[in-house]
Amino acid sequence: MSHSRRLSLEPAIDSITGRFRDLQRNDDDVNKPDFRELDLGSPVSTLMPRGSASSSAAATPTSSSGSSGSASGKPSVSSQMAKRLDDAYKSHSGELSSPGSGMPTTTRILKPGHRRSSSTGTPLIFSGSSFTSATSHTSPQGGGSGATSAVSPNTGVLPAGNICPSGRILKTGMASRTSSRTETLCTGTGNYGHGNVVRSGGGGGTSGKAVRVAENGENPEELKRMGNDMYRRGSFSEALSLYDRAILISPGNAAYRSNRAAALTALRRLGEAVKECLEAVRIDPSYSRAHQRLASLYLRLGEAENARRHICFSGQCPDQADLQRLQTLEKHLRRCWEARKIGDWKTAIKETDAAIANGADSSPQLVACKAEAFLRLKQIEDSDFCVSCIPRLDHHYHSQPQVKLFGMVVEAYVLCIQAQVDMALGRFENAVVKAERAAMLDQTNPEVVSVLNNVKMVVRARTRGNELFSSGRFSEACVAYGDGLKQDDSNSVLYCNRAACWYKLGLWEKSVEDCNHALKSQPSYIKALLRRAASYGKLGRWEDAVKDYEFLRRELPGDSEVAESLERAKTVLMNRSQESKSLGFNNEVEAVSTLDKFKKSVALPGVSVFHFKSSSNRQCEEISPFINTLCLRYPLVHFFMVDVEESMALAKAESIRKVPTFKMYKNGDKVKEMVCPSHQFLEDSIKHFLL
């Protein structure tokens, strides 16, 4: 018997043990016939000259099986063959950065016990007046086969060896109708009929499952190539679907995982992309392309530590562009940390914006840092907008290993900021849920624990205050809301609720004050504006009431109650203006320069305010615009101005030693004198004597 031909085996699995496992697992899913039905009508002869095979060429491959004992045996694989398999399976030719290469070829390996009995080498199949070589041959592109015929005087030839099952004869012309699919000689204990030759889909399979799918027309390398084409065209969803199908066939291929990560990145599903890259690195720790993708993803997520780990991993020359981005990100994060420690929130906003502009455009923690800065600056609406812009990653995504920002796990930090913003806007139930989740993620961090405790106390105080208000116990409700404000001194909801209590108690000044606190952080807070406008009406400050109602009318164009309140306030204001004119009020500050005019002004009925000022004094110049505002705000009050430099005799008669000085008279009697008062104190004094 002649030499046994050893042909190359296509790389098809990640490991020999993997093939044993997969073939055994999927064997029951495949219906493999024990033999092929053949027509017995072909006249052949066993007389075939040995020299007749000298001109044989490559032919279409046919299924070859060994003796019946070969199916039950467990042939061993040499160490050299295992090495060739391992080398082949580490190839990542399917990477997006380099277009798909040709498919590896598939040929048969004849193991011991599977040698042909022909001493001439390649057996021949006779068809009509020609005979054909049955040797499998693949083109360099990994697929094609051909057949070359030679004329022979012999008309009845039976090929040597065991091409046909025992007792069966090939039908004339059968070789030309044989399937063009390539064959793979497999190992293992699975039942594949006679021998271990099974059909292959052209190469690229990695397991028994891959062989099965290939029979249905699916090929992982072809799917990868199609996915790459879709990716280049910008059809990322279609590319992702194709990569998914390739991974289903070959889950142990790192290149497929990396390509899937690229498609997910293009779809802005960064959390899932990170997980795919991590899986690719787990499969092949030396896969540099996956490390590079991971570094780029971590830079976009603002995770500098993880990015550095993959940019500078052992055996890889760092990409200078990524390295520069990493260093810039680290610089901005460091400056942001320093600004937060000293409460320089404007600098913190500036540094987070710079880090995002540098490429960390999908970092939840950086956007949360900006939201925290706005929250501390009492700009609640801006903070809420930032929270709404926080990138939504896969809810199963967690940085691996965990990354911290400001000493907190980044996921816990983001949840803490969201909880505080929710609490400031009255979304108390959401605040509790997020604070509890943050505490679960970072149980030992004191700042996270403090946020959770504060949220719970504020929610408890608000609930207690609402219950007391509903039962008509307004004074006790004020105390309950005040307890909540001790924990969160900028909570606009608690201020607004307490303002409602003050209104019910008839303390309209306090109601206006609490509404002002609420509107300081939320300028468009509708409830606070409604309550302040109503309080202004009770105080007779109709001009201020009209301003609030006009704003509410623009915000609530379909609200009939707001429209009625606005008309009523305007009517009252007009009537008051006409009344003031009839009584001699002119709604502007009047200058007084002589002692006689001063005495006449003091004798006017009602409240009169005299402002002694100097044109060269800075404080006088600062408070003068406010006096003009008060003149319009309180039309039933007389406002006068005395320039001490121009009326020195009057200033001396009134003993004016420092400016600005204010003197108040009611019905001709002096009731109060103030030197350099604050705006609030001056207005409070006017309101006190006006009522």
From Swiss-Prot:
The keyword Cell membrane belongs to this UniProt entry's keyword annotation: no
The record's keywords, sorted A to Z, are:
Phosphoprotein, Repeat, Stress response, TPR repeat
TPR repeats located where? Answer: 220-253, 255-287, 289-321, 327-362, 412-445, 458-491, 492-525, 527-559
The record, for InterPro entries, names: Thioredoxin-like_sf, Thioredoxin_domain, TPR-like_helical_dom_sf, TPR_rpt, TTL1-4
Q: Name one GO biological process term.
A: response to auxin
| PROSITE patterns the UniProt entry points to | TPR, TPR_REGION
Question: How is this protein annotated for GO cellular component?
Answer: cytosol; plasma membrane
Organism domain of life: Eukaryota
Gene inactivation phenotype reads:
Altered vein pattern in cotyledons and primary leaves. Mutant seedlings show increased sensitivity to osmotic and salt stresses in roots.
Induction line: By salt treatment in cotyledons and cold stress in pollen. Repressed by auxin (e.g. IAA).
The task this protein performs is described as: Involved in osmotic and salt stress tolerance. May play a role in the control of meristematic cell size during osmotic stress. May function as an adapter protein for BRL2 and may be required for signaling affecting leaf vascular tissue pattern formation.
Q: Domain remarks in the entry?
A: The thioredoxin domain is inactive.
Q: Subunit structure, briefly?
A: Interacts with BRL2.
Query: Which protein, by its recorded name, is this?
Result: Inactive TPR repeat-containing thioredoxin TTL3
